[in-house]
Amino acid sequence: FAAISGIVVAGTAFAPHWLLQLPVFFALALLFIAVRRLSGIHLYGVGACFMLAWLLPTTYWYYYFMSPGVAFGASVGWALLQANLFWIIALRRYIRTYGAVVLFVIAWCTLTYIRTHAPVVEDWWIPHLGYSVWRNDSITMWSAYGGEAVLEAIVLLCGVSIAWLIVHARMSVWIRMSCGLVVLVAIANSIV
């Protein structure tokens, strides 16, 4: 599921219409469901698989101004570095699943905030999760309150919410709630 989720997230970054970007939420939900029972090195492996499937296709333009080896190394290096965030999910043994998921989202968004504001790395061209919703005005308007980190928090929390519904609610409930989320985003997008 990790590779499929990564490919879907990468694909939504290139979607020509905001409606085609909605699968990002379900792709992340599948990712969160896949990691909920894993521990240790398996979490890192799934995280690395997801990050590589997402970042390698979205850094295609590195090859235009870097040598192939440097471009590939930069993409793989960042993917493997960011996959370390998945170790946080192993903390669920100590702080329960909800605490680990919240800490994961906070850590991801903090890393993004630092990456986009720190003096040396602010100009690094690394794809953001927010690219997967960049055509959706009802979501991107929230970037005024914290930039890319806020967009990533919204995308991650929507994925977590859908994963929770799939795991904990009856089938009819999660289908209705997931469809409701999609309809809510669609309505909000048409208003903005």
Question: Over which residues does each language-model region extend?
Answer:
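Membrane-embedded alpha-helical bundles of multi-pass enzymes
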Residues: 1-192
